[in-house]
Amino acid sequence: GDELIKISGIAKGSGMIAPNLATMLSFIFTNADINSNLLKTLLKRAAANSFNAITVDSDQSTNDMVSIFSTRTIKIGQNISLNDKGVQKFEVALKKLCLNLAKQIVVDGEGAKKFLTIKVINAKSISSAKKIAFSVACSPLVKTAIAGEDPNWGRVIMGIGKSGEKIDKNKISIKFGEFALAENGTPVENIDLNKIKEYMKWDSIVIEINLNSGSDFFVCFTCDFTHDYIDINADYKNST
């Protein structure tokens, strides 16, 4: 029909943010006529690369919830299933909304000044790529390097190594933005340091890790660690 299907959402979170269990609350609302079981499936799929792909400080909490509610007032199609075109369009919109909310949580991270995207590509599996991405994203040394605007790819290598994944170090290539700093495990020569320094001043930084070991990938999102994060959490006092 011509009736408009709407999806709206709100989210709360700034510290103790990590996948699967965080100090995070998100509520999503829609008027689409989709049953609860299918909505649950769609939300789980949307959360995999959004709410479960972010970390502020890698710490967890029990106050973690993402919920979706529907008034079921607007018909979305005849055969309500994952194969229905209306449901597929709805899923695309839901994924965009969840990713937008998840990124806003990271931007609002305690003391955060920079938004950091970690892309792990050409991995042997999605689970391996995810493990490596979060190992780098959760590293205090990586996060403080970003805060200090230092393209320290050695710290990225450290983060990859401590993931525990079996990889060939001679195949690893690393980029900060468009700038290649390491290729096939060795430093890139004749780097334009001035351009890289200018890039590191940006509010949003992308680190690409190419494992050259497969065809799978994973992208996660985090922020830098600043003095403000220390001040916020050092000043916090338990009331008990």
Model-based region annotation:
Residues 1-240:
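A structural signal for small-residue-enriched, beta-sheet-centric alpha/beta enzyme cores
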